[in-house]
């Protein structure tokens, strides 16, 4: 019979430190989908409703920008 293996608990996510630049690089490399709903109401009457659906990803040669490049404006 084998002896039970005890493993240390992994570090909590709050204790891990990561630079913002590294986080953005990881997120943009694979892409991020954001969705959300916001409703502003007074006395149970909905006044404003906002639905957010966004896809955020990096632009490269494989996935070109959908907008034309900006032209230089000379004074």
From Swiss-Prot:
* Keywords assigned by UniProt, alphabetized: Gas vesicle
| Entry's Gene Ontology molecular function annotations | structural molecule activity
Asked if the record carries the keyword Transmembrane helix, the reply is no
UniProt main location, coarse: other
Q: Does the keyword ATP-binding apply?
A: no
Per its UniProt record, what InterPro entries does this chain match? Gas-vesicle_GvpA-like (IPR000638), GvpA (IPR050530)
Explain what induces or represses this protein's expression: Gas vesicle production is induced by growth conditions that promote production of secondary metabolites tiancimycin A and B.
* Cellular component aspect of the GO annotation: gas vesicle; vesicle membrane
- Domain of life where this protein originates: Bacteria
Where is this protein localized, as stated in its record?
Gas vesicle
Q: Family membership, please give it.
A: Belongs to the gas vesicle GvpA family.
Tell me what else is known.
Answer: This strain probably produces some gas vesicles from the probable gvpO-gvpA-gvpF-gvpG-gvpJ-gvpL-gvpS-gvpK operon; it can be induced to produce more under certain growth conditions.
What this chain does, per the entry, is described as: Probably a minor component of the gas vesicle. Gas vesicles are hollow, gas filled proteinaceous nanostructures found in some microorganisms. It is not clear what function gas vesicles perform in soil bacteria.
Q: What is the protein name for this chain?
A: Gas vesicle protein S
According to its UniProt entry, this protein's organism is Streptomyces sp. (strain CB03234)
State the organism's lineage.
Bacteria, Bacillati, Actinomycetota, Actinomycetes, Kitasatosporales
Name the gene: gvpS
